[in-house]
Amino acid sequence: MKRLAILITVISFATVVNSQSIPKMKMADVVNSFSNGSDTMYVVNFWATFCKPCVGEIPGFIDIVKKYKAQKVKLLLVSLDLPDYYPAKIAAFVKKSHFNTNIAWLNETNADIFCPMIDKKWSGAIPATIIVNGKTGYKKFFENEMTSEQFEKEVKLALAK
């Protein structure tokens, strides 16, 4: 319970990465962050510093989530970078890229176990994104790069349901 309270605190308040320590998370913690039945809509994006499509879509995600902040939309970027990248290389990359949002590093190595926790069809490829609106029951998983236009369309759908 204490762990969940800490996790919710991390997710609830946008942590500015410029001086942030990036928390380690288990996939169960990630799932719990959006399974709490709250009236907040969560966008969880799985990415890595070495994944060009991942890095390319993140600025648009950040801008769109800011646009819908009043509707309680929150973004969590979950890095799937290798352990050698944690935390220094990830933090430096995030700072250089101006990714001012919630960031965590997935402290898991077995994709056969953690991928189905998000979606049974997830092969482990990135970028991958799940959008969950606890208030409406909307839940949709994407295993591909999304344009800003596609992403905003999905955010609008999730808010309207």
Regions found by a protein language model. Give the residues of each.
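Thiol-/selenol-based redox modules, centered on thioredoxin-like
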Residues: 126-161
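Short, internal strand/loop/helix patches
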Residues: 93-126
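Short pre-active-site segment immediately N-terminal to redox-active cysteine/selenocysteine motifs
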Residues: 40-42, 47-50, 125
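Conserved redox-active cysteine motifs that mediate thiol-disulfide chemistry
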Residues: 46-60
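A short beta-strand-turn-helix
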Residues: 21-42, 65
